[in-house]
Amino acid sequence: GFNAVTSVSEEWALNYSKESHPDRKTRYQIADEFLDVVTGLWENRELRFDPDGIRRFYADPINHQGKNYQVLGPLNVAPSPQGRPLIAQAGGSGPGIKVAAKHAE
């Protein structure tokens, strides 16, 4: 699974090239965009059989241009048997619940 955590401390934020810890609303806006990107990458690839019977990997660019991320894609890793990991998000604030409702299983 994939646990989408927006971090709780200044020290953790510094691990991701941030000069300071964003406020809660901003963290969840960033998380929402990140989850859009990563699920787009996960869901935009497949293994399928060509007409010649050979199983091949296919993936298309996602061309994401957002406020926080610019990702052309595609993800260059074949999908796992389940396609993508289960997404968990345990935020209890209003913004956290909104992100969980949109992205988490």
Describe the function of each predicted region:
Residues 2-103:
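Internal, glycine-rich beta/alpha segment that forms the wall or movable "lid"
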